[in-house]
Amino acid sequence: MTEERAVDDPQSKRWEAAEEGMELLHAGEADQAIDELLQLARKDPQNEYAFHFLGHAYFEKEAYPEALKSYVEALKLAPGYVGAMLGAGQTLRMLGEYDRAIRMGQRVLQSQGNDGDALFLVGAAHFQKGENQAAKRYLERFLETSPELEVALEVEGMLQVIRGEVLPFPGAEDTVEN
């Protein structure tokens, strides 16, 4: 595919339209990103990227119901959108909807094999449910994906709790998100 053809591709155009909101989000400007992405979603309600990154911005603000709604909209437009599935799954986990979060993560694993983000999602949700053996399986597989140090240390901490080496800390369900 030539670069000219890629720019004319409707999916590429939708991605480009969402770039300003993505940049604001990456710069830590979640409120501005929300404004930008809401504007884009109103202008182009078929833009799955607007809804996905809007979900991410709401997640950053801990506005989980709004985040979930945005991720679901992205998935209505693009049912196979892995990023939106993972975002929805992490949001469900933060809302305490562990079974639904696990199902979402497993859906990603069915299509993506050993996706690190999905392994973390499923393992963390099982851990939060107290299903230690299932959590251990997924979290150990997650560590095999060579994750970033911060998340790897968090997962090592969960595994230490599972093995009985340390006691869980208060608020153990509030974990770092990918």
Residue map of PLM features:
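Alpha-helical segment of the N-proximal tetratricopeptide repeat
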Residues: 10-49, 53-60
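TPR/TPR-like (Sel1-like) alpha-helical repeat modules
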Residues: 116, 127-153, 157-164
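Structural signature of alpha-solenoid helical repeat scaffolds
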Residues: 8-9, 42, 76, 110, ...
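Canonical tetratricopeptide repeat
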Residues: 53, 87, 121, 155-158
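Helical anchoring/docking segments at protein termini
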Residues: 1-4, 10, 171-178
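Helix-start (N-cap) detector for alpha-helical repeat units in TPR-like alpha-solenoids
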Residues: 14, 48-49, 82-83, 116-117, ...
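Alpha-helical adaptor scaffolds
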Residues: 22, 46-111
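Structural signature of tandem alpha-helical TPR/SEL1-like repeats
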Residues: 27-39, 60-73, 94-107, 129-138, ...
